[in-house]
A protein has these predicted regions:
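N-terminal Sec-pathway targeting helices
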Residues: 1-9
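Extracytoplasmic cell-surface/polysaccharide-interacting catalytic and binding patches
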Residues: 8-213
Length: 213
């Protein structure tokens, strides 16, 4: 009897290990959404070649897709009413700007004593390859605090609790790196529309998992 139980448990474990990579494979192969605000871009899904964006320039020189500007402004106004003062540190980036960020990160690791291969590998854990960065869509922003009025932690806490009400999601949550391909970034928020944002928030999932339903 004991032998039968052991064999049964072994078969269950084998099935779990078989299904896990299969599930990841499904998440990594996401069809291109017809909705501009639900396009999934990550290390496995590049920006569509026909993607175009009209930009609005913010007061600090950063730029975002003009279609998300009203929602971003509304979110920031709400935060300020609560005594929280966020600023957009990074908005839209061109292909060339994304390449420069990656190159600079690689150089920084080399200057710390990393080999070329290790520097490239480590840099790519933190910086997306050109063509796979949401910043190139214009609908993702890195948000920090106006340091004279708030702390980053205060801003991150407020955003985590409220951003979904304004159509934004925390794009790279903790514990989702295997699925998103990106480490936890409490500053990186992405516009997805209010319905998707609220569902993603309420279910505690990431954008890739949203498309698994």
């Amino acid at each position: 009897m004991r032998g039968i139980i052991i064999v049964y448990l072994f078969l269950i474990l084998c099935n779990l290990f078989h299904e896990f990579p299969s599930r990841l494979g499904n998440l990594h192969s996401i069809p291109v959404s017809e909705e501009w605000y639900l396009i999934v871009v990550n290390r496995w899904n590049e920006i569509p070649e026909d993607h175009r964006v009209e930009l609005t320039e913010l007061s600090n020189g950063q730029k975002v897709d003009s279609r998300i500007y009203p929602y971003l402004q509304e979110m920031f106004d709400a935060a300020r009413k609560d005594g929280i003062y966020p600023v957009v540190r990074e908005g839209y980036r061109t292909y060339e700007e994304q390449q420069k960020i990656l190159d600079d990160k690689i150089k920084a690791y080399i200057n710390e004593g990393y080999s070329q291969s290790r520097a490239e590998r480590t840099a790519k854990e933190w910086v997306a390859l050109p063509g796979t960065s949401e910043h190139q869509l214009g609908i993702a922003v890195d948000i920090n605090a106006d340091k004279s009025k708030s702390s980053n932690d205060e801003v991150y806490t407020w955003l985590a609790a409220n951003a979904h009400n304004y159509s934004f999601i925390l794009r790279y949550p903790q514990g989702k790196q295997e699925i998103t391909g990106t480490s936890y970034e409490p500053w990186h928020y992405r516009y997805v529309g209010v319905d998707a944002a609220r569902e993603i928030y309420e279910r505690g999932i990431c954008l890739e998992e949203y498309f698994e339903q």
